[in-house]
């Protein structure tokens, strides 16, 4: 595919948009995951580990096909399994590829106070710059998908980058190259939405899945990873996919009105001190009279005179 723009449009620790240098490409990229054709082979998990330089580790998540309960700081791609009993009593194995959703309105970026620790490129990818991460973990509370994960030894937070290093030079993400069934697709956002809607229509019209649809939640401005689901009305069945994800109200409150009020309070305090100084001047200390001690008692010769008056003649 063509190269997508790596121009920075937003960074953490700054309000509004931030222009940056990048490739002169305007389109936004998108990954489409068709859960109806996923076989749970985990080839995408292996490809993600290998491309990003992480080693395999033994897991203890037994009695399930799933590798581990959730993604980890060094395990960004995870196939989630759920055995769902249908209305007719038959069992259906639902599988979903779990990774960063690369939201158009990312909660992690909104919550992060560190300068340029999180960046959003013009192609839609949300990337972490670990060198600028301060390890506060606020991004973890801002994400409605529970994706950013903290690494205690390094005190940094990590997540899927949508293989931005590959995408920026015209390559597909590693997980998509490894998929044997073609359930993963990559292209522009408009192309992937059209392909997803076509597939959902096929499922409704020809496969008996009347509730099939596309998962591209509006609560976070849409995402650059979208899903085709058999049952789009109940996304929670697919490994806990939130039905209506939104940035937590606490993050919105802290980053908008409370931050503004705090700044206004600081400015008001500075202005108040300046006005007080201009009206009353610097604080003046009244000098102590030379014949009075700090405790208000007579001093010097007066004390001697009084002591002399009290002596018998």
Label the predicted regions.
Residues 1-313:
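Non-ligating segments of multi-cofactor redox enzymes
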